[in-house]
């Protein structure tokens, strides 16, 4: 022991200066015999270096303290004061426990404390070390700059004044530049005020319709007379020749006021019919003879202002079937009309309409072309209408002579025949439905099958109820036989 104390009192080697703790300690060999040998231990951070002597030339063992759990006092069965301590390994590491023996109790406590600190450093080694990859390192901004020999002189007072004046000058310049950067306000207003008397932009505005003077309105009224209004005038022409001359002068002004006040969507049904089928309507002979030269040009400009002719209406089968009843009644009324109301044949030719379904439809106010050729052929544009009307200079004989140029009797007869066939077929269907509705429904296979299915369902329901009762009460052989007979009975009754 004295030798050990002498060794400890001797000077520490040069390697011990960098170590956390160094000294001579007895270390167990770990064998069965448990031999103890003096070793020079050197604690560096998280490593324990074991040497044979203080020269630190031959390292016998290197212990990584991170693989151990803790260092504590070793208690033996014998109560001798050996001052021993042990390094306990952490679970999961394939290292063995190491036993040491210190020369004194104080030395033992100091080594236990130092080794525990080394173990903690080994455990936290991953957190303490900061590894910086050189490839990912960012270059410093000013580290590689060339440094001058002297430091920069502080700015003088004159320099500060110059900087302040330049800054104030720049701010004033910015203030002056603000209006220029904003939207131009004064220059465009002056330009507009100078250009106002010329008024060139007004040409781009949509043209405002000026109120027409008395002369222009008279000219336009003399030029405009729609075909629909012309179709209305023959009704008043049948009253007499003298009142027509007085009413013809009054009707244009009234019609103009009515047309201007009412939009196109609120026109009467007769006007719509006249627009869709303008060709069969012609002016009356007495009216054409009595109209003055000033009233004749009223038709052309008014027609130009009217909306364009709608596309031809092709009646569907449902529409024709709905109108068939009206056409049949209209044809019977129109056949009786020429015998009673029109004794003269001139009225039929003047109106340009024969005993067709259109006369009945127009009298009842139902829009729709009656002749088949008018329904199938597209409506002629209003620009071609003046060519179809007879000239005003033609006489009554010319009108009567040219009237048979439009052969419509065969087509009208065919149309009537088709309508009669449709009406007859509909009436037959109605009668057949009434007869079938009054008779009892015949026995069919579906009703028999449904009855059989219902009987089978009732049988299965009764069988299920009997099964439930049989589970509660003990079934006798007689009940089982009855149930079988009942099932067979239901099966036989089912088709």
From Swiss-Prot:
* Low complexity biased stretches: 324-335
- For the modification Phosphothreonine, which residues carry it? 233, 296
> Any idea where the PH domain is?
18-120
Where are the Phosphoserine residues found in this chain?
A: 165, 168, 236, 238-239, 274, 292, 395
Query: Which residue stretches does the UniProt record annotate as biased composition, category Basic and acidic residues?
Result: 399-411
Q: Which InterPro entries match?
A: PH-like_dom_sf, PH_domain, PKHO1/2
Q: What is the lineage of its organism?
A: Eukaryota, Metazoa, Chordata, Craniata, Vertebrata
GO biological processes = macrophage apoptotic process
Respond yes or no to whether keyword Iron-sulfur is given for this record. no
Annotated Polar residues bias: 235-244, 336-350
CDD domains the record matches: PH_PLEKHO1_PLEKHO2
Disordered: annotated span: 171-411
A Pfam family reported for this protein in Swiss-Prot or TrEMBL: PH
Keywords assigned by UniProt? Coiled coil, Phosphoprotein
- From which residue to which does any coiled coil extend? 444-469
Q: Does the keyword Phosphoprotein apply?
A: yes
* Pro residues: bias regions: 198-213
UniProt protein name: Pleckstrin homology domain-containing family O member 2
């Amino acid at each position: 022991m004295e030798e050990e104390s002498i060794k400890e009192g001797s000077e520490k080697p040069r390697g011990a200066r960098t170590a956390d703790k160094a000294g001579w300690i007895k270390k167990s060999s770990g064998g069965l015999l448990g031999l103890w040998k003096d070793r020079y231990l050197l604690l560096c951070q998280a490593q324990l270096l074991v040497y044979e002597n203080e020269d630190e030339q031959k390292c016998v063992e290197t212990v990584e303290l991170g693989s151990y759990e803790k260092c504590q006092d070793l208690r033996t069965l014998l109560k001798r004061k050996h001052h021993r301590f042990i390094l306990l390994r952490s679970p999961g590491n394939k290292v063995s426990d190491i036993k040491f023996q210190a020369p004194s109790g104080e030395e033992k406590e100091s080594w236990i404390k130092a080794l525990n600190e080394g173990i903690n450093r080994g455990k936290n080694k991953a957190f303490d070390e900061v590894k910086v990859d050189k490839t990912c390192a960012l270059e410093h901004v000013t580290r590689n700059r060339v440094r001058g020999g002297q430091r920069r002189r502080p700015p003088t007072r004159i320099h500060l004044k110059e900087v302040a004046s330049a800054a104030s000058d720049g701010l004033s310049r910015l203030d002056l530049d603000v209006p220029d950067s904003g939207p131009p306000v004064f220059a465009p207003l002056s330009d507009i005020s100078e250009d106002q008397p010329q008024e060139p932009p007004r040409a781009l505005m949509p043209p405002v319709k000026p109120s027409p003077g008395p002369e222009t309105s008279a000219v336009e009224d003399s030029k405009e007379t729609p075909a629909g209004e012309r179709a209305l005038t023959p009704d008043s022409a049948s009253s007499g020749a003298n009142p027509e001359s007085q009413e013809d002068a009054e009707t244009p002004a009234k019609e103009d006021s009515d047309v201007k006040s009412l939009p196109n969507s609120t026109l009467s049904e007769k006007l719509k019919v006249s627009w869709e089928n303008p060709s069969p309507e012609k002016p009356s002979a007495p009216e054409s003879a009595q109209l003055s030269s000033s009233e004749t040009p009223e038709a052309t400009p008014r027609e130009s202002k009217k909306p364009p002719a709608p596309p031809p209406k092709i009646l569907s089968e449902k529409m024709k079937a709905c109108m068939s009843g009206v056409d049949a009644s209209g044809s019977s009324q129109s056949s009786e009309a020429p015998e009673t109301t029109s004794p003269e044949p001139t009225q039929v030719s003047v109106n340009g309409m024969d005993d067709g379904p259109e006369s009945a439809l127009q009298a009842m106010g139902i829009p729709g072309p009656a002749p088949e050729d008018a329904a199938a052929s597209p409506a002629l544009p209003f620009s071609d209408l003046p060519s179809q009307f007879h000239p005003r200079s033609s006489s009554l004989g010319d009108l009567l002579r040219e009237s048979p140029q439009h052969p419509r009797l065969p087509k009208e007869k065919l149309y009537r025949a088709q309508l009669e066939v449709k009406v007859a077929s509909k009436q037959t269907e109605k009668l057949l439905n009434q007869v079938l509705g009054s008779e009892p429904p015949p026995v069919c296979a579906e009703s028999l099958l449904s009855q059989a299915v219902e009987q089978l369902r009732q049988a299965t329901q009764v069988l299920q109820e009997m099964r439930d009762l049989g589970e509660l009460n003990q079934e006798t052989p007689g009940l089982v036989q009855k149930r079988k007979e009942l099932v067979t009975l239901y099966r036989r009754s089912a088709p």
